[in-house]
């Protein structure tokens, strides 16, 4: 239900009227409440009783809605008897009521600064309330200096000292021209642009959960560590020029150090380069190598959601096969139909057919046909200090079968290992079932 109230000449769209002395003779026998719409239901009248009856007010106590204590200020002080009721206002429709322009008189700054009421204007002198306000814009920001004897703060809320449980928050939730004291005081976005997202929030106020993700991007400084040529007067030193973006660093490296087509010496002079001054046969190979030092990766994966980037176009081409499912490299061994996305994986697979085991463990000299098997085996050595189980490596591919290991072992260790294995089997019967088919029951 939309409640249509009359605000008088000061606040024509607030709809709170009937507080002038001209209507006191009409309210002698009933409560002086809000000037409700005559078309509203009578049952809603009790919900808007904001002040005590007029005959209950003593000479020293004033209602929150009398002109002497309200935010109407001096304009109502001089024209208190001219505040009309709802019947005096001509509203053709609800649209006229909601969109009426509030261009009528504004309270004087001297009176508005000293009087604080329910509908006081909070702006600085000479500035009116912005259009599009709520019907009840909120209470005045109550501080320790503004708290009156008729109001007190309970649990962060201000009690108005009226008849009825009417509470209002001390901070109005509206756009005000005056500085605010809440956590979003800098929400005016006066420093907003695409590079500066800081809200200039005061140090004593914490930022909201949303603004912590709007931090200013960290400025990047990339330094060139190319060793310049030494002369008789100047020893060899690094370039040490700094750049704010990768594009600027790459452009500098291409123009200043790598050189153009006339450059025949394709040597990397980056500081502490492991090549040690060894030259490349072609310029493009030097360019690809320099990306190892600069960290440039100019080839992103075009498939949405992947997000991987690569330093070489060849690596991107191989990676895209994981999305397309293309496997152009077929196993050359007769009778094998395995296919692979790159030639290196095919080469690793060929060791299965040739029985070659080029991947050797440096700890125990065991060899394997695939590097993944060697990596699994290395985990056994890493866990030997904490895991004393003799069957820790039983699930890994090994060059020597377990039976041969026990046959080649020394005689004194046979009895001890057999006894130890028997004890472990009797002790771990509850952990490892004798038949692995029981896992699938």
UniProtKB/Swiss-Prot annotation:
Sample GO molecular function, one term: sequence-specific DNA binding
Induction: By dvr1/vg1, activin and t/bra in the mesoderm. By heteromeric AP-1 (fos/jun) during activin signaling. By increases in Ca(2+) in the dorsal ectoderm, triggered by planar signals from the mesoderm. Suppressed by bmp-signaling. By pbx1 and meis1. By zic1, zic2 and zic3 but not zic5.
Extent of Polar residues compositional bias: 406-429
Spans traversing the lipid bilayer: none
Keywords assigned by UniProt, alphabetized: Activator, Cytoplasm, Developmental protein, Differentiation, DNA-binding, Metal-binding, Neurogenesis, Nucleus, Repeat, Transcription, Transcription regulation, Zinc, Zinc-finger
PROSITE patterns with a match to the protein in the record: ZINC_FINGER_C2H2_1, ZINC_FINGER_C2H2_2
GO cellular-component term (any): nucleus
Region: Disordered, residue numbers: 375-441
Gene Ontology BP annotations: central nervous system development; determination of left/right symmetry; embryonic axis specification; neural crest cell fate commitment; positive regulation of DNA-templated transcription; positive regulation of transcription by RNA polymerase II; regulation of transcription by RNA polymerase II
Primary residence: nucleus
ZnF C2H2-type: positions: 222-257, 266-293, 299-323, 329-353, 359-381
Superkingdom of this protein's organism: Eukaryota
InterPro entries named among the record's database cross-references: GLI-like (IPR043359), Znf-C2H2_ZIC1-5/GLI1-3-like (IPR056436), Znf_C2H2_sf (IPR036236), Znf_C2H2_type (IPR013087), Znf_ZIC (IPR041643)
Pfam families for the chain: zf-C2H2, zf-C2H2_15, zf_ZIC
Expression by tissue: First detected at early gastrula (stage 10.25) in the dorsal lip and prospective neural plate. Also expressed in the mesoderm at early gastrulation, with expression strongest on the dorsal side. Mesodermal expression continues at stage 12 but is hardly detectable after stage 14. As gastrulation proceeds, expression decreases in the dorsal lip and increases in the prospective neural plate. At the neural plate stage (stage 14), expressed strongly in the prospective mesencephalon and anterior rhombencephalon, after which expression becomes stronger in the anterior neural folds.
Subcellular location: Nucleus; Cytoplasm
Regions of compositional bias (Low complexity) in chain numbering: 383-399
Function recorded in the entry: Probably acts as a transcriptional activator. May bind to the minimal GLI-consensus sequence 5'-GGGTGGTC-3'. Can determine the ectodermal cell fate and promote the earliest step of neural and neural crest development. Involved in establishing left-right asymmetry in the embryo.
Record text about domains: The C2H2-type 3, 4 and 5 zinc finger domains are necessary for transcription activation. The zinc fingers and the N-terminus are independently important for establishing the L/R axis.
Similarity section: Belongs to the GLI C2H2-type zinc-finger protein family.
Protein name per Swiss-Prot or TrEMBL: Zinc finger protein ZIC 3
Organism: Xenopus laevis
